[in-house]
C-alpha cells in the first residue's frame, strides 16, 4: 500500500555527506566576533514623556457606563436600574435615535420617537409621517434632540432641546411596571459642577421594548462628570505644542548624544502609526460535517503605509496573543453540531504587536538603550459573524462585536518578513473590556444557544492608533558603515515563510483531488521513487534529494517511535502512535495509505522548486495529517477499539457494546494485527441500520478492506463517501 513510502523512509538510511556538511554550515554554525568599540561615554538625558497630538477618548472610565452597544432593541425588563441614561456620541448628520410604541401609528396608542437634528435642518418624524399634523416636522437652528410624541388620543406634540455636547442623551425613569418617564434638558455648556437632567419630564405608558437605530451607551449613574471630562481634550494639544516649541524642531528628531572617532550615540524620536489586524482561522474536523475542530486567532503578518513628517513609511507588524481563554460547544457526534475549541480574548489577554518600518531608525538598530514609548490604546469594534456550514438545517453563527486594549509597555524584539530577519519593537497591549460573544442557532437574530464574556471571532478587521517612540542607538560615526541586520536571515524562518505561502495552495489542491483518484493511489505501492517523480522541477540529484528528505524525516514523531525498542506490552497512548511497524493485512487500508497518497498527489500538482520545502511537506504529512486516529483489533468476533477519547469493545455481529478488558487489550496489542479504523463505529452502525449490511460485508468494513471500501465509493454510498471525505479534509498543512 501507499504507506510503504513512510516505511521505506524509516527502514532505509539515505545520506549524502557533502550535502549535510553544507547544510550544517549554513544553518547551525555560530561565529562570535568581538569588536572594541573604543572609549565613549553615555549622556543620560532627563526623562521625557512624548505625546501624539490630541487624542479623544471614546471610552468612559466609569464601570457604571457601558457600551457602545450595537443591538437594535432594548428590552426594558432587562434594565436592572430604575434610572437609566441613554447616551449618544453626537452624530454628524440628522438621524433617528430611538422609538417606543407600536410598529405603526395608531391614534389611540401612545408612542414617542427621538431624533438628532443637525443645525439649520428640518427634522421630520418617520413614525408620524402619515399624519397631516404640522407637529410632525421641526426646523432646528442648533444641534438638537427632538422628541415627537402622542399619548392615547392626545394630539401629536414635540419637544426640542439643544445638544451642544460631544456626548449626551436622555434620562429614562422606570416608574412602574406599566409607566416610564422621559426626562430631557438643554445640553449647552459645562459651567456648573452638576446638571439637572429633568428640565422637562413626561410620563408615558411602558412598552416591552424600545427600538434603537444607532450605537449607544447606557449609564446607571449620573454621567455628567464623565461627559464633562471627555469634552476637554484641548489640554493634550496645548501640552504637545509646548513640547514642540521647547525642542525647537519637528517631533521626528535625530540627535547626536555622544561621539568619538569610531562610534556615536544617536537619539531617535518618531511618531508612529500602529495598525491592529485580528483574524480567526476556522478548522473543520472530519466525520459527517457537523464537527469543527477549532476557531483560533492566527498570528498575523500585516503591512501598511502612512506618511510621517512628509516621509512615506512602509510598515510591517506581526500580531500575536498570550493568555487566551478556551471554550468548547456541542453535543455528541455524529449529527450534533460541535466545536472542539475556540479561543476567547478576555480581560488580561495580552496582544503583542511587533513593529518595523523601512525608515532610517531601523537600519542600525543593533545596540539600543533608553527605549521609551507613549502609545494610545485600541478600540477594536466591529460587528463580526461566522456561520458554520453544517450539512442540514440552519447554519449556527458565532458573533463578536468589540474588545478594547490598553497599552502596557514596549521592548525590543525580532520578527521575520519576506525571508528577512529584522530587529523591531514590540508593543504590549492588555485587553481591559469587551462587549461579549454569543452563538445563535441561525442568523444573528435567531435564538441564542450560548454566550459569554470576551471576544471570540474576527474577520480581519483593521483598526489603528498613534503614538511616539524614542531610543538611543549606537551606530558607526562613519555613515558608510552599515550593520547587516537588514539582510540577515535564517534558513528555518525562510522555510516557515515558504510553507505559509504554500499552505493555501496546497490545501486547496488537496481538497480538489477526486476521491477515486486518491483511493486508487492509496492502493498502489508508493515508494520514494514515486515521490521524486512528483516533483520534476527540483534540479538536485536524486542522492541529494533523498539525503535532505531523510534528514528531515528523522525528526518526525513517526520515525522516533519506530526507531525505539519495542516493549512486550503497550500502553494505549503509545499504541495510537506505534502502529507503523505492526503486522497487517495486505488488502487492508490504513491511515498512512491515505495521507501519503494525498501528499504525493498534491505535491505533484504544486510543482515544487526546492528540496527543503519538499522535505518539510513529507515530514508534516507523516505527523500532522489525520490527527484524530482510531485503531482496532479483532478476535473471535469481538472488536476492541482505541480512540483519542477512550477505549471500548463491541460484538461484530450485533454491534452491541461489551465490557472492555484492559488486560486482554494489552495482550492483543503486542501480538495481534492492528487495523486502522478507516470506517469508524458511527458509520458502521449507520450502515447496518440504514442498509442492513450482511455480517461478511460488515467484517470487511471493520477490517478496513480496501476493495470493499472502494466498491462502496464507486456505488456512491453516501455514508462511506462522507467518512472518507472527512478523513481527506484532515490532510492539511
Curated annotation (Swiss-Prot):
GO biological process: permeabilization of host organelle membrane involved in viral entry into host cell; virion attachment to host cell
Pfam families, alphabetized: Rota_VP4_MID, VP4_helical
Record bears the keyword Coiled coil: yes
Superkingdom of origin organism: Viruses
Keywords, comma-separated and alphabetical: Capsid protein, Coiled coil, Hemagglutinin, Host cell membrane, Host endoplasmic reticulum, Host membrane, Host-virus interaction, Membrane, Outer capsid protein, Viral attachment to host cell, Viral penetration into host cytoplasm, Viral penetration via permeabilization of host membrane, Virion, Virus entry into host cell
SUPFAM superfamilies the UniProt entry points to: VP4 membrane interaction domain
Residue stretches spanning the membrane: none
Keyword Repeat: no
Family matches, as InterPro entries: Rota_A_VP4 (IPR042546), Rota_VP4_MID (IPR035330), Rota_VP4_MID_sf (IPR038017), VP4_helical (IPR035329)
GO cellular component terms, A-Z: host cell endoplasmic reticulum-Golgi intermediate compartment; host cell plasma membrane; host cell rough endoplasmic reticulum; membrane; viral outer capsid
UniProt-listed Gene3D superfamilies: 1.20.5.170
Site feature: Cleavage: 228-229, 244-245
Coiled-coil residue windows: 492-512
Family, per entry: Belongs to the rotavirus VP4 family.
Protein's name according to its UniProt entry: Outer capsid protein VP4
Record organism: Rotavirus C (isolate RVC/Cow/Japan/Shintoku/1991/G2P[3])
Lineage, highest ranks first: Viruses, Riboviria, Orthornavirae, Duplornaviricota, Resentoviricetes
Amino acid at each position: 500500500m501507499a504507506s510503504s513510502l513512510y516505511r521505506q523512509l524509516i527502514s532505509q538510511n539515505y545520506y549524502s555527506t557533502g550535502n549535510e556538511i553544507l547544510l550544517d554550515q549554513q544553518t547551525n554554525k555560530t561565529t562570535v566576533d568581538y569588536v572594541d568599540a573604543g572609549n565613549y561615554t553615555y549622556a543620560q538625558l532627563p526623562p521625557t514623556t512624548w505625546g501624539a497630538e490630541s487624542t479623544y477618548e471614546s471610552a468612559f472610565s466609569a464601570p457604571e457606563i457601558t457600551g457602545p452597544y450595537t443591538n437594535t432593541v432594548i428590552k426594558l425588563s432587562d434594565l436592572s436600574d430604575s434610572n437609566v441614561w441613554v447616551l449618544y456620541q453626537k452624530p454628524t448628520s440628522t438621524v433617528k435615535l430611538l422609538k417606543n410604541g407600536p410598529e405603526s401609528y395608531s391614534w389611540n396608542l401612545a408612542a414617542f420617537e427621538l431624533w438628532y437634528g443637525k443645525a439649520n435642518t428640518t427634522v421630520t418624524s418617520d413614525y408620524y409621517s402619515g399624519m397631516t399634523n404640522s407637529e410632525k416636522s421641526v426646523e432646528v437652528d442648533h444641534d438638537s434632540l427632538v422628541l415627537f410624541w402622542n399619548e392615547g388620543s392626545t394630539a401629536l406634540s414635540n419637544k426640542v432641546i439643544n445638544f451642544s455636547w460631544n456626548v449626551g442623551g436622555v434620562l429614562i425613569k422606570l416608574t412602574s411596571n406599566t409607566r416610564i418617564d422621559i426626562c430631557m434638558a438643554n445640553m449647552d455648556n459645562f459651567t456648573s459642577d452638576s446638571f439637572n437632567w429633568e428640565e422637562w419630564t413626561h410620563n408615558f405608558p411602558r412598552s416591552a421594548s424600545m427600538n434603537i437605530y444607532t450605537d449607544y451607551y447606557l449609564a446607571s449613574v449620573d454621567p455628567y462628570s464623565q461627559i464633562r471630562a471627555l469634552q476637554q481634550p484641548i489640554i493634550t494639544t496645548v501640552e504637545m505644542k509646548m513640547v514642540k516649541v521647547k525642542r525647537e524642531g519637528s517631533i521626528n528628531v535625530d540627535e547626536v548624544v555622544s561621539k568619538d572617532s569610531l562610534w556615536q550615540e544617536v537619539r531617535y524620536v518618531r511618531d508612529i502609526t500602529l495598525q491592529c489586524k485580528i483574524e480567526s482561522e476556522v478548522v473543520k474536523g472530519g466525520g459527517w460535517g457537523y464537527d469543527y475542530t477549532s476557531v483560533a486567532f492566527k498570528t498575523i503578518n500585516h503591512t501598511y503605509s502612512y506618511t510621517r513628517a512628509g516621509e512615506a513609511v512602509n510598515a510591517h507588524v506581526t500580531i500575536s496573543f498570550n493568555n487566551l481563554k478556551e471554550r468548547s460547544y456541542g453535543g455528541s457526534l455524529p449529527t450534533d453540531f460541535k466545536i472542539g475549541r475556540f479561543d476567547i480574548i478576555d480581560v488580561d489577554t495580552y496582544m503583542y504587536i511587533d513593529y518595523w518600518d523601512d525608515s532610517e531608525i531601523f537600519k542600525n538598530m543593533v545596540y539600543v538603550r533608553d527605549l521609551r514609548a507613549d502609545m494610545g490604546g485600541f478600540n477594536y469594534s466591529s460587528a463580526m459573524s461566522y456561520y458554520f456550514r453544517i450539512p442540514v438545517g440552519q447554519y449556527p453563527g458565532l458573533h463578536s462585536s468589540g474588545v478594547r486594549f490598553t497599552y502596557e509597555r514596549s521592548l525590543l524584539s525580532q520578527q521575520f518578513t519576506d525571508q528577512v530577519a529584522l530587529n523591531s519593537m514590540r508593543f504590549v497591549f492588555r485587553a481591559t473590556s469587551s462587549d461579549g460573544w454569543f452563538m445563535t442557532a441561525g442568523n444573528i437574530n435567531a435564538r441564542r444557544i450560548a454566550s459569554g464574556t470576551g471576544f471570540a471571532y474576527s474577520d480581519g478587521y483593521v483598526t489603528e492608533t498613534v503614538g511616539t517612540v524614542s531610543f538611543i542607538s549606537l551606530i558607526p560615526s562613519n555613515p558608510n558603515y552599515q550593520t547587516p541586520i537588514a539582510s540577515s536571515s535564517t534558513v528555518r524562518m525562510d522555510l516557515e515563510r515558504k510553507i505559509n505561502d504554500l499552505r493555501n495552495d496546497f490545501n486547496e489542491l488537496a481538497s480538489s483531488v477526486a476521491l477515486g483518484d486518491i483511493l486508487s493511489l492509496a492502493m498502489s505501492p508508493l515508494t520514494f521513487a514515486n515521490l521524486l517523480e512528483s516533483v520534476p522541477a527540483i534540479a538536485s540529484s536524486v542522492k541529494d534529494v533523498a539525503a535532505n528528505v531523510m534528514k528531515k524525516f528523522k525528526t518526525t514523531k513517526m520515525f522516533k517511535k519506530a526507531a525505539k525498542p519495542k516493549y512486550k506490552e503497550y500502553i494505549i497512548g503509545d499504541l495510537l502512535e506505534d502502529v507503523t511497524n505492526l503486522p497487517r493485512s495486505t488488502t487492508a487500508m490504513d491511515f498512512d495509505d491515505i495521507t501519503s497518497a494525498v501528499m504525493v498527489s498534491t505535491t505533484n500538482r504544486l510543482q515544487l522548486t526546492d528540496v527543503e520545502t519538499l522535505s518539510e511537506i513529507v515530514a508534516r504529512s507523516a505527523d500532522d495529517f489525520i490527527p484524530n486516529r482510531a485503531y482496532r483489533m479483532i478476535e473471535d468476533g469481538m472488536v476492541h477499539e482505541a480512540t483519542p477519547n477512550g477505549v471500548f469493545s463491541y460484538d461484530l455481529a450485533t454491534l452491541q457494546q461489551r465490557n472492555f478488558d484492559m488486560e486482554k487489550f494489552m495482550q492483543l496489542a503486542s501480538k495481534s494485527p492492528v487495523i486502522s479504523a478507516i470506517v469508524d463505529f458511527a458509520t458502521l452502525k449507520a450502515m447496518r441500520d440504514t442498509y442492513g449490511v450482511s455480517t461478511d460485508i460488515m467484517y470487511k468494513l471493520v477490517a478496513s478492506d480496501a476493495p470493499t471500501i472502494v466498491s462502496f465509493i464507486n456505488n456512491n454510498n453516501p455514508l462511506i463517501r462522507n467518512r472518507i471525505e472527512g478523513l481527506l479534509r484532515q490532510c492539511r498543512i
